[in-house]
UniProtKB/Swiss-Prot annotation:
Protein name (record): Tryptophan synthase alpha chain
Species: Citrifermentans bemidjiense (strain ATCC BAA-1014 / DSM 16622 / JCM 12645 / Bem) (Geobacter bemidjiensis)
Top-level EC class as recorded in UniProt: lyase
Gene: trpA
Pfam families for the chain: Trp_syntA
Key words, A-Z: Amino-acid biosynthesis, Aromatic amino acid biosynthesis, Lyase, Tryptophan biosynthesis
Amino acid sequence: MSRISDRFASLKERGEKALVTFVTAGDPDLATTEKVVLELERAGADLIELGVPFSDPMADGPTIQLSSDRALASGTTLPAILELVSRLREKTQVPIVLMGYFNPIFAYGSERFAFDAAQAGVDALLVVDLPPEEAAELKGATDSCGLDLIFLLTPTSDGSRIASVARQGSGFIYYVSVTGVTGARSAVADDLAARVTEVRGALELPLVVGFGISTPEQAGEVARAADGVVVGSALVKYFEKYQGAELLEQLGGFVSALKQGVLKGSR
């Protein structure tokens, strides 16, 4: 059983849904990211998504694009992110997902990257621009290393796509709540709960919902239907305003509030 499966199983036993938090690795630098991950876990995050910065993040809105730019400007590389995860594994067993685009993995080499990521203590990869039908090579590599490979579903995914993702994915399935790019929204889509319930019925893996969730109230609303809630852009915005100890304090307070929202939605 993977760390991710273990975490979802223990949450299910307690009748809780998962809070998944996203931050960009290396924003503003990797030393800060290390402290941030530990603070996110302390404040209530159940899983951590670390964004791999990329120069052309087509699925991301301006908040995460700017975060990616800051991380690249500080010299963040894929090998350095793996070194960060290795350091974190000396301090925490929180499940860590690397989320990003296929180009940096392709440049690194899929098999070598999967091996190195597993050795570092990464639990899963989520490659935004790699659909199941193009993922055979990476899937083989992750399977051989014991890494989960997470795929996306969207509001426009049909039955065959849902079946394909259910067959090939592991860890959990990530449901994108809205079409378009990442970014905080003022409200959750009216039909989200019904659609999530429908999709969830076709899956054995946990279904987490992300894109656009920015308040504890929205997190609770989504948690009523899903197995977990992802918050990204709303967290990343704090990196534009704060730094150092104040950044950690602000992030911790916000994540604690999000966790309370998720707990309310779990009941």
